[in-house]
A protein has these predicted regions:
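Interaction-mediating elements
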Residues: 1-96
Length: 96
């Protein structure tokens, strides 16, 4: 079961839509049915990253099977930036 945990310092106003869009992205990236995908969101989480508290996002991506961080990082970063406006250089992704 793929799990995407998103922790961000900003408030996400349309949480349900964001969660749905994340679930669809994870399904696409892992080639697994969306019925097995779990997405967790932690917004308004105080975060200190790169020596300041500017808007940022931490992504923890877990899945049994193959994850390809070098290919997935760019797509996830662009997705997050487009969805919630976090600059790509303020997104940190951990793959397990």
């Amino acid at each position: 079961m793929p799990l995407l945990s998103v922790s961000t310092s900003i408030e996400i106003n349309k949480k349900n839509l964001f969660l749905k869009n994340c679930s669809q992205l994870v399904s696409k990236l892992t080639n697994k049915s969306e019925q097995y995908v779990m997405v967790r969101l932690f917004d308004q989480t105080p975060t200190y990253f790169n020596m300041d508290q500017s808007p940022s996002c931490f992504i923890d991506f877990k899945s049994i099977g193959s994850l390809n961080p070098s290919e997935m990082s760019k797509e996830i970063s662009i997705f997050i930036s487009n969805q919630i406006g976090i600059p790509i250089n303020r997104i940190y992704i951990c793959f397990e």
